[in-house]
Amino acid sequence: MKPPQRRRRVPARYVGEATGPTAWSPREMRHLLRLLQARRGQPEPDAAELAQELRGRSEAEICRFIQQLKGRVVREAIQKMQPGGREGPRHQGTPLPAPVEVWMDLAEKLTGPMEEALTAAFSQVLTIAAAEPLSLLHSRPGKPTKARGKALVFLSNQDGQKDPASEGSGPVPMTAADPTREASVSDPKASGANPETSGLASEVTVPDPDAPTKSLAGSSTERDLAVDFEKIYKYLSFSSRGGHGPELSAAESAVVLNLLMALPEELSHLPCTALLEHMTKTYAQLMAPQTALPGEKRPRPGTEDGGTGSTGPEEPDQASPQASEPIEPRLAWKAVGICPLNPFLVPLGLVSQAPSPSR
């Protein structure tokens, strides 16, 4: 006997109704209004006190609703103070919003009900990257791993001779390859005394020809020079969720700062023309008015206010297996509305470095 049909459900972390706040009923709003009127003399209402008398609502929900009320009061006051709205005389000289502000507003509309899922997924990507073998190889000191990388070519010393550590045969694990390493000149005597530590001595010696070369000693100094990329990834993962990550050393903080400072330079290496065409096309599609398909019984959420058509999942009857259209891979995300980590559906080839003409 054929079993009954089982309707597939979207995970709760991707459903807008599950992650978003529930709507306030008129009874709850009237009750909250009476509570606020009774506390009219207070400068700021206490959310914890209101939550005790308003059953079924948490402190965060009450604070969020009060902020919405404040925003509505501000908008009404602005409309009274500035007659004519945006067409009035005071708005004629108002500058247009910057492009980044337009994209940020559109991204908030797309990922509003899924912000928690997006943040968790982005944090998981950084957590997985912390366990990559290359992260362990590039750390200083290196961590034990079965992966092997290419041998690093160290800088030559004053005599023009290569470092003995780079002349070894066979692949060796990379010890340190981070942006914080600076070129420093080592003493020939110190570099020839111990071939195994000459590569490290060339990095930590003082570039003063008059003073004798000495290796940095002390646990505090070694801790400042240590670079653990696993800790850096964990720090970025905690920061993306608004938490407090592990404390970074001086060298690790320099790596994070160098990554942030290198972002403007990396933008010039992207295929800007193709990326511009894709973003322009995507913006036009998202802002275009959505028309209901013949098989749909009701429009998708979000088509009334912003025209994005991607602010929430579809109704369950639209995702039923009785649909006549052929099942395509992209329909898996259609039930969700958007891809959490890629709301603008940018191809991965457009976020990699474009080949230069010299290559």
From Swiss-Prot:
InterPro entries: SNAPC2. The keyword Transferase does not apply. Keywords: Nucleus, Transcription, Transcription regulation. GO terms for cellular component: cytosol; nuclear body. GO terms for biological process: snRNA transcription. Signal peptide: none annotated. The keyword Transcription regulation applies. It is found in: Nucleus. Residues 1-22, 157-221, 291-327 are annotated as: Disordered. This is snRNA-activating protein complex subunit 2. The lineage of its organism: Eukaryota, Metazoa, Chordata, Craniata, Vertebrata. The gene is Snapc2.
